[in-house]
Amino acid sequence: MANPLRIESVTQINNERGQKTLHPLVSVLDQSLSKPVKEARYISDVYMIFLKDEKCGEVKYGRNHYDYEEGTLLFIAPGQVFGFEESENMIQPTGWGLFFHPDLIRGTHLGKCINEYSFFSYDVNEALHISDAEREIVLECFNKIRYELAHPIDKHSRTLIVSNIEMFLNYSVRFYDRQFLTREHIHKDVLTGFEGLLNNYFQSEKLQILGLPSVSYCAAQLNLSPKYFGDLVKKETGKSAQEYIQLKLIDVAKEQILDISKSVSEIAYKLGFKYPSHFTRFFKQQVGHSPNEYRKSLN
């Protein structure tokens, strides 16, 4: 498999798509008016957001494939591999693209909080599907950025462009919250699977051999990206995925402590702790009592 093609700058994107560069660090493109692109895998040094206006080909993102549907928003952060199955074909995308270099937001409020927009780390099959009304809001944000790009660059340009990008991202947070709500029944099934996964893990020897399962491990077992999985669990339970796993471990630990034939050290090793003192400290942080104190209070 060939190495992915690197996209190094906004100017490169504009040149390859046959568009004029109005600002070296940011661009909004009408895909239907741009040159076709080669079907290949890409890795980008810039942030890329795509709004699709109609159904198009199958997109490959990481290890997964996704049938890119109409009214879909896809967010790609620098360093992520995306694209199509490799071929010599040229395709004509439709919809819109927003591209901005990290240097545009460096030192700004958005630059400091960009990592909080966790959907940049979602898998492509977890893309955002928007309604017609939401699409109009997205295009309004894009058009405000386009207006600033058409305006001669002055001391206000960067502030106004970045603030409109941030507003668009904040709207996207709202739209994702709506999508989480409308897919609640699907997410309940994920939580049921998560609970079953933890039960099986804790009942096996994995806990003693491998230690506590990580959020990434659980997400992979459920065919979700860690960020999407974490956001899903947080919205459905009010707890982070890590907190949920730890609470499950505490439940198992409490059951073990009830068995007075087992020492605290035995329980600690069985639960995957290398040192009993680490287990005692962890248990006390979570419960407010040491394992021995908890055992005495119940007996």
Residue ranges with predicted function:
Residues 162, 184-222, 243-262:
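A short, Lys/Arg-enriched amphipathic alpha-helix from helix-turn-helix/homeodomain DNA-binding modules
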Residues 68-82, 99-102:
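Conserved metal-binding segment of the jelly-roll/cupin
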Residues 71, 229, 278-279, 283:
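Short hydrophobic/aromatic patch on the recognition helix
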Residues 235-274, 296-299:
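Terminal helix-turn-helix DNA-binding modules in bacterial transcription factors
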Residues 87-153:
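A hydrophobic/aromatic-rich effector-binding and dimerization subdomain
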Residues 1-67:
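Generic protein-terminus/edge-of-domain signal
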Residues 280-299:
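…primarily DNA-binding HTH/wHTH and HhH modules…
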Residues 136-199:
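An amphipathic alpha-helical interaction segment
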